[in-house]
A protein has these predicted regions:
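Hydrophobic/aromatic residues within well-ordered alpha-helical segments
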Residues: 51, 58, 62, 66, ...
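Amphipathic alpha-helical packing segments from all-alpha helical-bundle domains
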Residues: 113-139, 150-165, 182-194
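Secondary-structure edge/capping motif, primarily at the C-terminal ends of alpha-helices
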Residues: 70-74, 101-108, 136, 140, ...
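Hydrophobic alpha-helical connector segments
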Residues: 71-99, 153
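N-terminal positioning helix adjacent to the helix-turn-helix/winged-helix DNA-binding module
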Residues: 8-15, 152
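C-terminal peripheral helix-coil segments that are non-catalytic and often amphipathic
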Residues: 131, 165-215
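Helix-turn-helix
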Residues: 11, 19, 23-53, 57-61
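Short hydrophobic clusters on alpha-helical segments that form packing/core surfaces
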Residues: 12-20, 66, 90
Length: 215
């Protein structure tokens, strides 16, 4: 069995995540992270020698949770609800790790070690997303023409991965509210909407939801 994680290390990561989301990756210094965790900088350096090391540890946390949310074995059956739950779960997760998305440009410049990790994770998540589309098609919930499948996949990945940075850059949003999550889910539902089958639309009509994946 592996060595159990240090409680202090986990407390530092918990505090760092809150601070990074609130202040941004650029403004959150190691001194502020240590203060938020209730320790001095010397103790922080015992666990994380650099701010980049904190970023990497939080990315590892996110990766574990993201891959658990989108497992290789996807929901069976012909109901839309499990896929809607995946959608809501994804946006809740990205809100919790907001700094990774909102501050992506700074992170890749300031923490070069993140770049290959982010690329690998992005590729893995793209394949999981491809599997979601395939499962929805097999369940008779969507029908996507072969010629449009890769374009839909790319647009789903762009919206699901960059919605927070769009809000930050275009609208100056730094702190996300439930309304922002609802907006982001709506953008993704709009991409699915043209491809929903009669079966899926009937399920939405029964719940009073508009076309798209029900929130």
């Amino acid at each position: 069995m592996g060595k159990p994680p240090s409680p202090t290390r986990e407390r530092v990561l918990d505090a760092a995540l809150v601070l990074l989301n609130a202040l941004g990756a650029e403004r959150a210094t190691t001194r502020l992270i240590a203060e938020a965790a209730g320790i001095n900088e010397g103790n922080l350096y015992y666990h994380f020698r650099t701010k980049e090391a904190v970023f990497l540890a939080l990315l590892a946390r996110f990766e574990t949770e993201a891959l658990a949310l989108l497992p290789p074995a996807l929901p069976g059956g012909d109901r839309l609800a499990p896929y809607a739950a995946l959608l809501s779960g994804w946006f809740a997760l990205t809100r919790r790790f907001l700094f990774l998305f909102r501050d992506a440009a700074f992170l890749q410049q300031a923490a070069p070690a993140l770049r290959p990790r982010l690329r690998r994770l992005s590729a893995r998540l793209l394949e999981r997303l491809r599997a979601v589309l395939a499962a929805m098609e097999a369940a008779g919930l969507i029908a996507v023409p072969e010629a449009l499948r890769e374009s839909l996949l790319a647009n789903l990945a762009i919206v699901s991965g960059h919605w927070a940075s769009f809000l930050a850059l275009q609208r100056g949003v730094r702190r996300l509210t439930p309304a922002h999550l609802a907006w982001a889910e709506g953008q993704l539902r709009a991409l699915y909407a043209p491809y929903l089958t009669f079966r899926a639309r009937a399920q939405l009509a029964a719940t009073g939801q508009p076309a798209g994946l029900a929130p």
